[in-house]
UniProtKB/Swiss-Prot annotation:
The gene is hemE. GO terms for cellular component: cytoplasm. This is Uroporphyrinogen decarboxylase. It comes from Prochlorococcus marinus (strain MIT 9211). Disulfide bonds: none annotated. CDD domains: URO-D (cd00717). One of its GO terms (biological process) is protoporphyrinogen IX biosynthetic process.
Length: 351
């Protein structure tokens, strides 16, 4: 029976659905009071994301509050790094810090192949519990960072404004960078397969910093490794829909559609109608409401959702933001977003 399959999974597979499913990137997080209360009690981000009880609880907070159509694992794209021999910490308000940035070949040679069941079994445990808890009321989503973005963090050593260190490596020692990217592609594909085997029904790959590359360099340093991850996962899990997100992707949108991914997640700088026109019909679209709009009035949120959904008509489509929800967003406006998404057919019929 079709209805026993969650709406988001059916939509992601390209089946006909009554309405677009809706979820939000970073839907579990700082804008929610219950999350901030828990953060005060457990100030270490790594503890919150690596303790299975805490990760499960945080993943479930937005589901209990808003009943989105997707429940995404609360974790971090850097979570698999220690399993490869790269230690990191996440400092509140500063972001990730890599203990020993990767800058030479001897460091790359010492990297281990990732064994997720040994180095991050808590991820598998949380995904299993989420599947048990949400049943067919929502799809469970897993996620990873793409090779370029992981490399950007581990080479730079932290977040960066201009990515000068990794770009210097790219243009001075490209073979060195390719070795690192290739290592990450194999390990990340393995990690995604582990997440799917543990219960993830849809998975998203974040190449957050690939938008910092020119199109020609995207084709050299990002796209081939996105494609390698996708191909490796599809080899063993062909039925699992895969989503690709890049922040600032307007310049590489068509290239994203050629990676073999099932769904491209648009950021808000691309008009939904234009994004649909620029991607092949067989590639689904996710997005792409500006998260800043959630500081606006309920009327403006509803109007933008109507506009976005109308422009995506006829496409395989998942309603989402164009980036993660911002800290400080009023919780009531997040509720408006979810409720408007779920009742979008009625809202459109009233316009």
């Amino acid at each position: 029976m079709t209805q026993s399959v969650p709406l988001l999974l059916r939509a992601a597979r390209g089946e006909n659905v009554d309405r677009p499913p809706v979820w939000m990137m970073r839907q579990a997080g700082r804008y929610m009071k219950v999350y901030r209360d828990l953060r005060d009690k457990y100030p270490s981000f790594r503890e919150r994301s690596e303790n299975p009880d805490l990760s499960y609880e945080i993943s479930m907070q937005p589901f209990r509050a808003f009943k989105p159509d997707g429940v995404i694992l609360f974790s971090d794209i850097l979570t698999p790094l220690p399993g490869m021999g790269i230690d990191f910490d996440i400092v509140e308000s500063k972001g990730p810090l890599i203990k020993d940035p990767i800058r030479n070949e001897s460091q790359i040679k010492t990297l281990r192949a990732l064994s997720p069941s040994e180095s991050c079994p808590f991820v598998g445990e949380v995904l299993k519990r989420l599947r048990d808890s949400v049943g067919n009321e929502a799809a469970v989503l897993g996620f990873v960072g793409a090779p370029w973005t992981l490399a950007a963090y581990v080479v730079e050593g932290k977040s960066s404004k201009n990515y000068a260190v990794i770009k210097a490596m790219a243009f001075q020692e490209p073979e060195l960078l390719h070795k690192l990217l290739d290592h990450f592609a194999d390990s990340i594909a393995n990690y995604l397969c582990y997440q799917i085997d543990s219960g993830a029904q849809v998975v998203q790959m974040f190449d957050s910093w690939a938008g910092q590359l020119s199109p020609i360099d995207y084709e050299t340093f990002a796209a081939p490794y996105q494609k390698k991850v996708i191909d490796l996962v599809k080899k063993t899990h062909p039925e699992t829909p895969m989503i690709l997100y890049i922040s600032g992707s307007a310049g590489v949108l068509e290239r994203m559609g050629r990676t073999g991914v099932d769904i491209v997640s648009l950021d808000w700088t691309v008009d939904m109608a234009e994004g649909c026109a620029r991607l092949p019909q067989n590639v689904g679209i996710q997005g792409n409401v500006d998260p800043g709009l959630l500081f606006g009035s309920p009327e403006s949120i509803r109007a933008r959702i109507i506009d976005t959904v109308k422009k995506a008509k006829g496409r395989k489509f998942i309603l989402n933001l164009g980036h993660g929800i911002l800290p400080g967003t009023p919780e009531e406006n997040a509720r408006v977003f979810f409720e408007a998404g779920k009742s979008v057919n009625e809202l459109i019929s009233q316009t």
